């Protein structure tokens, strides 16, 4: 395994301090899930279907706690977003006091419990866009119920994704000191997530399901898909794309999980960042085995294995993060949110047989090079590096058009775009 060097105690202490500073809800009031009843003029509204394995909280304004419930509870939750002039893409604006100011803060507009086995199906039918696509979000470690709801509302709003949005929130206590409890809670929630995905994919109103999971939620997601494949012999055909953002996954374990999905598995896209400090700590406390979300996809053995498995990797290392941990770039970066939304709105996967996501990024880089009239490296022109076979072909075609001199300059980058972890099955 690459780079299994022990982290100094001082560095670990620094990571813990940073996580403590960013983890909590220090300045947030308790009870943001209290419904306001109506959305204020000038705001935008995001309607979400929220399924959870959390236990109900005694406080109705909190709604659900970090403890484990006995079943799957489903709610329709509407969230209002402040006017564009009062916010930045990628930000969740928490109220500093209640009642929240809808012109400045995210506000819960309504919360409606959905009873019965088919309640979720009815909600999907009434909220299904023309694309007939569903996007399921699974949050990560150290998230409360409201964290998952507001974060996904922000992603849906900022990406302009043409989807019916579904949140699956599992029993995280929202504390950095409950890492092991949270991990066991993901295992506790596998059956429920598998059932939700199976029902969603079986809904005749749905044509396509994309799953986006973050951090520890990627473990839950891949485990649920693995369980589905073992139970049924395959993953549900409508589940075409799986996006793993900053995956807190042991690379060796992921290789085995991926192989268990079989040949007719979804296409996987992974967001990685070598400067992810949260994953650095996770790696340290997990036996110093590389975490999937922190690998360098341009080096071996990852390059060849990812390429053979047909996995697309977006390396966000050079992209500026929105927090000191660099663990939420996928949602906080306007560039990444836009890339996700543009592909989903077009009714395409993150990459497809005709256009690689890297082509859009590459076009920006190539345009900059042409404008400058000089040889500029793709890696310098854009902070997002894309690694997949289709992207490499697209870059090659563009490079030929730009001439051999440019080809010589960016050739090394082009060679790296095609990374490919697990062996192809």
Features from the language model and the residues they span:
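The conserved beta1-alpha1 loop
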Residues: 136-140, 214, 246
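Lipolytic serine-hydrolase domain surface
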Residues: 26, 30-110, 121-123, 128-130, ...
